[in-house]
Amino acid sequence: MSQARFIAFSDGSALVNPGGPGGTGYVVLDRARPAYRFGGTRWVEDGPNAVTNNRMELRAVLEALEGLPGGEAVQVISDSRYVVDALSRWIHGWRRKGWRTASGEPVLNRDLIEALDARARDLSVTYTWVRGHDGHAVNEVVDQLAQAAARGVAGPGEAEVVAALRAEAFLAGGPPAPRSSRA
């Protein structure tokens, strides 16, 4: 793991892909305090921006980065190769080619990718891929948050988030209750 001040775990879910409804889940840890926040959002979209798994994955990263102070280092951890590759590798070529893929097609989810690119300019963001459903406790919690948001039901609460952060040694001792929040 990097020594970034913020670690943002994110996941997205589409119950019907494409078409939704979908949900996002995230946990953001501020290692300088230590403090954390977590949440998720239910999404229903149609038309050209219909809910897909990839759109929900991108939205989850946007939600995680929201409100972070500029100039800070952030490590985004995702189980989506699409998110990690799109935002750390492919984006450079897409920009050079006028937002076209190698085959000349328009880049899908350009609106969200450009929004993330703009947000990342104010931060020092690195993207790390982890295998989903492979024992990463915080990744499992954000998956549950995204699934619950997509279904419109309550997801994991603070106790589950704290347990996951402790399991991966991101938190020691008790939870930073005075500074934690649910979005």
Swiss-Prot record:
Record: residues binding Mg(2+) 1: D11, E57, D79
Magnesium among keywords: yes
Name the UniProt record assigns to this protein: Ribonuclease H
A molecular-function term among this protein's GO annotations: nucleic acid binding
Keywords per UniProt: Cytoplasm, Endonuclease, Hydrolase, Magnesium, Metal-binding, Nuclease
Function: Endonuclease that specifically degrades the RNA of RNA-DNA hybrids.
Residue ranges constituting the RNase H type-1 domain according to the UniProt record: 2-151
Subcellular location: Cytoplasm
